[in-house]
């Protein structure tokens, strides 16, 4: 419950660790001791700017609406979100126009994992218990 209360306060884009993603124990932003963004840690880079799992970020409703309005005004300045497996998060976050260093980092500055990706949990349980 605490996790969702934190997400509710997201103004622009928030990020947080997600457990058991893509063969790794965690997918998370990596921060320094002062809470400043250093890089993303994820099992798959793929040349993405935003190396983050879909379950590892939230967008504030007001920010989303503001960016959607801008998208409708000036479509030429936005990345068209064509489907490409593994790049959905990247395209979406590029259009939100918030660089990773400006993200709101939740879960005690990304030190605690409060969410696991259920797709991968199902995969792991199938492998280990069948």
Enumerate the predicted regions with their spans.
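Catalytic donor-sugar/metal-binding loop of nucleotide-sugar-dependent glycosyltransferases
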Residues: 90-114, 121-124
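Intrinsic disorder/low-complexity detector
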Residues: 34-36, 92, 119
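Conserved catalytic core of nucleotide-sugar-dependent glycosyltransferases
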Residues: 1-86, 102, 125-129
């Amino acid at each position: 419950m605490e996790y969702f209360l934190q997400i509710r306060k997201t103004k622009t884009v928030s990020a947080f660790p997600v457990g058991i993603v893509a063969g790794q124990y965690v997918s998370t932003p990596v921060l320094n001791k002062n809470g400043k963004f250093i890089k993303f840690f994820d099992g798959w880079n793929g040349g993405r700017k935003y190396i983050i799992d879909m379950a590892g970020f939230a967008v504030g409703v007001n920010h989303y609406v503001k960016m959607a309005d801008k998208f409708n005004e000036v479509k030429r300045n936005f990345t068209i979100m064509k489907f490409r497996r593994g790049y959905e998060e990247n395209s979406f976050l590029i259009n939100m126009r918030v660089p990773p260093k400006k993200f709101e980092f939740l879960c005690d500055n990304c030190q605690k994992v409060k969410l696991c990706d259920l797709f991968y949990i199902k995969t792991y349980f199938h492998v280990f218990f069948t």
